[in-house]
């Protein structure tokens, strides 16, 4: 294979340019910060995740948890199907209340189709179509979780009240 880029004298056979030293140092610092207290961050997220799952399933009827509970679930992941609700409508309803969620994976966000993953694990079309994915981060606090638990039943209730099903 012939080279298409040449480097400076003395390095031309090794690489076609200079290292991005600020980028390398920045990546090192970003990595260090991301992994700092990783286990504590994961423990905290699991607590918030479990609180959301438990409260939503108890307080909002006709809901289904997608995926396992406990340690077999990612610490930042809450995916729930709201029956008689359209997932995309729920994302809009929640965004009007300052809560930002997703109704599907990022790679299919422009398609109004249910998640192929949820269909593959046995969810019915209607169940998968009413799913919402909530992602948690270390930036979220207890007040954020409480706020979601306050506005989510309102949003689901409003959509169900106008649903033809």
What spans do the regions from the language model cover?
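Conserved core segment of the aminotransferase class I/II
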Residues: 1-42
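General beta-strand structural signal in soluble alpha/beta enzymes
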Residues: 1-3, 65-67, 101-103
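Predominant activation on well-ordered alpha-helical scaffold segments within soluble catalytic domains
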Residues: 2, 24-32, 53, 57, ...
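A general structural signal for well-ordered alpha-helical segments in protein cores
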Residues: 21-24, 49, 53, 75, ...
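Structural signature of PLP-dependent enzymes
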Residues: 31-54, 64-74, 165
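Anionic-ligand binding region
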Residues: 52-56, 61-93
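Conserved C-terminal alpha-helix-loop-beta "cap" of PLP-dependent enzymes
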Residues: 78-133
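PLP-dependent enzyme catalytic core of the Aspartate aminotransferase-like
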Residues: 113-165
């Amino acid at each position: 294979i012939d080279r298409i880029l040449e480097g400076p004298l003395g390095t031309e056979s090794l690489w076609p340019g200079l290292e991005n030293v600020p980028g390398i140092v920045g990546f090192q610092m970003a990595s260090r910060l991301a992994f700092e207290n990783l286990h504590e961050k994961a423990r905290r997220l699991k607590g918030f995740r479990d609180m959301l799952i438990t409260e939503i399933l108890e307080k909002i009827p006709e809901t289904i948890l997608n995926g396992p509970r406990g340690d077999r679930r990612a610490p930042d992941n809450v995916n729930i199907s709201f029956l008689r609700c359209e997932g995309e409508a729920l994302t809009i309803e929640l965004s009007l209340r300052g809560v930002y969620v997703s109704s599907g994976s990022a790679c299919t966000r422009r398609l109004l189709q249910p998640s192929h993953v949820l269909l593959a694990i046995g969810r019915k079309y209607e169940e998968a179509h009413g799913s919402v994915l909530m992602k948690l981060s270390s930036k979220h606090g207890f007040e954020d979780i409480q706020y979601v638990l306050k506005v989510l039943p309102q949003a689901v209730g409003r959509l169900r009240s106008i649903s033809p099903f």
